[in-house]
Amino acid sequence: MLEILYQDEWLVAVNKPSGWLVHRSWLDRDEKVVVMQTVRDQIGQHVFTAHRLDRPTSGVLLMGLSSEAGRLLAQQFEQHQIQKRYHAIVRGWLMEEAVLDYPLAEELDKIADKFAREDKGPQPAVTHYRGLATVEMPVATGRYPTTRYGLVELEPKTGRKHQLRRHLAHLRHPIIGDSKHGDLRQNRSGAEHFGLQRLMLHASQLSLTHPFTGEPLAIHAGLDDTWMQALSQFGWRGLLPENERVEFSAPSGQDGEISS
């Protein structure tokens, strides 16, 4: 069962878990766990995608309950009328607030995109980012005697493939758990010492004008146990009040300290 964050006669939003595909492609024909099919079975009606989240990313996924609703939502996304807010845990201390305007070349998959044009130049890509908190943990990673992490809020203003992951890597603050654009040594350390076994990127909120009622709509997605455990260990509880789960209790020895 997926957590339904919002539902009316036109729209449905769910909290997509990390590791789930939004829908099957010909590359993933045998995939057992797919968001669209699960939601369809859960609510008893077809759903229509309007945007995507990468497989390892969790958070708000908004769909239409008719092809018209899906089309109108997709149009809003394409015209940048929907505000997206993400949170990430990154390598190092990213403390400033700024806008990164750094074009990105199209990232093609060797198999899925084998017929796509390869001569496209870099496309505009803009991300607003804001450092929320930092921590230094007494765990050696590589040649450093301690490990530094940062909690970052991200608002993409464009929608390039892997934009947030690539922009943070460009800033030299890759997202923890990013196997493609990240720091593999940091990824291993985060998984081993702090249970960060996934890409630490969460789609926390979508804000939009409802395409049928015209009312403002803000949808928030709660954080999973991996995220909540990280916030507890790093002393960051209370920083994401709209997304933290009140019922979560950190395992013994994991509230801002390392268990022996």
Curated annotation (Swiss-Prot):
UniProt-listed Enzyme Commission number(s): 5.4.99.26
InterPro entries named among the record's database cross-references: PsdUridine_synth_cat_dom_sf, PsdUridine_synth_RluA-like_CS, PsdUridine_synth_RsuA/RluA, RluA_PseudoU_synthase
Catalytic reaction(s) noted: uridine(65) in tRNA = pseudouridine(65) in tRNA
GO molecular function, one term: RNA binding
Alphabetized UniProt keyword annotations: Isomerase, tRNA processing
Active-site positions on this chain: D54
Transmembrane segments: none
GO terms classed as biological process: enzyme-directed rRNA pseudouridine synthesis; tRNA processing
Similarity-based family: Belongs to the pseudouridine synthase RluA family.
Described purpose of this protein according to its UniProt entry: Responsible for synthesis of pseudouridine from uracil-65 in transfer RNAs.
Name of the protein described by the UniProt record: tRNA pseudouridine synthase C
Organism (species): Escherichia coli O6:H1 (strain CFT073 / ATCC 700928 / UPEC)
